[in-house]
Curated annotation (Swiss-Prot):
Disulfide bonds: none annotated. Binds to single-stranded DNA and also promotes the renaturation of complementary single-stranded DNA. Function in recombination. Has a function similar to that of lambda RedB. GO terms for cellular component: protein-DNA complex. Homotetramer. Keywords: DNA recombination, DNA-binding. This is Protein RecT. GO terms for molecular function: DNA binding; single-stranded DNA binding. The keyword Cytoplasm does not apply. GO terms for biological process: DNA recombination. The keyword Plastid does not apply.
Length: 269
């Protein structure tokens, strides 16, 4: 059986009995995800505030915007959509929650490319805020010419006064979280550290790392800050999978995840 994503292991549940979706023999992903059986699976995975119809419309739009997605392994695409559903994140650049990218390696079963799910900057903030214990969360880039200093220890502090040159090269990226109990946590990364993370990402040379570098750098700092934040183990595991390996769903396995969580309406900085 194909390995399930971390969250799916915890809440694995059958939604179609012994009936499995038919194997896909062509690249018509749009037709496949509009099948009633797929709508049932997505409906079981989605939180209350989202519908299967909306997620399918979003997925269809992404395929039309990035035609290469339609030529990827269908089960890999479906698996990425299901994980977006599990996390309550909408793929696409409109909200910046998550991105779907064709992944260079070939799927060993179909011979096609896999689909890579990448959590975006705003998606990372949304996941963190769901704990209900975070008052604010933000990330900033530091440029040459900015006044910037930070200290660790018993009296930790961070000072950043931006300069006037908004086009100056980035030197650091940092993320700051203020907790509702009054505590503050921050994480600072150098550009060299950010580039090292990018080099280890399977999507480091395309997609948002190329088109939205600063947002991906901010997301990377927030992701590293997660280890200090009061977020659930399930969310931490999902975040740890970000950009690391493509997900797959076996067509013969009709298992999907169901989960409950509350969504906090947040207006991003």
């Amino acid at each position: 059986m194909t390995k399930q994503p971390p969250i799916a292991k915890a809440d694995l549940q059958k939604t179609q009995g012994n009936r499995a979706p038919a194997a896909v023999k062509n690249s018509d992903v749009i037709s496949f995800i509009n099948q009633p059986s797929m709508k049932e699976q997505l409906a079981a995975a989605l939180p209350r505030h989202m519908t299967a119809e909306r997620m399918i419309r979003i997925a269809t739009t992404e395929i039309r915007k990035v035609p290469a997605l339609g030529n990827c392994d269908t089960m890999s695409f479906v698996s990425a959509i299901v994980q977006c559903s599990q996390l309550g994140l909408e793929p696409g650049s409109a909200l910046g929650h998550a991105y779907l990218l064709p992944f260079g390696n070939k799927n060993e079963k179909s011979g096609k490319k896999n689909v890579q799910l990448i959590i975006g900057y705003r998606g990372m903030i949304d996941l963190a805020r769901r704990s209900g214990q975070i008052a604010s969360l933000s990330a900033r880039v530091v440029r040459e010419g900015d006044e910037f200093s930070f200290e660790f220890g018993l009296d930790e502090k961070l000072i950043h006064r931006p300069g006037e040159n908004e086009d100056a090269p980035v030197t650091h990226v940092y993320a700051v979280a203020r907790l509702k109990d009054g505590g503050t946590q921050f994480e600072v990364m150098t550009r060299k550290q950010i580039e090292l993370v990018r080099s280890l990402s399977k999507a480091g040379n395309n997609g948002p790392w190329v088109t939205h570098w600063e947002e991906m750098a901010k997301k990377t700092a927030i992701r590293r800050l997660f280890k200090y934040l009061p977020v659930s183990i399930e969310i931490q595991r999902a975040v740890s999978m970000d950009e690391k390996e493509p997900l797959t769903i076996d067509p013969a396995d009709s298992s999907v995840l169901t989960g409950e969580y509350s969504v906090i309406d947040n207006s991003e900085e």
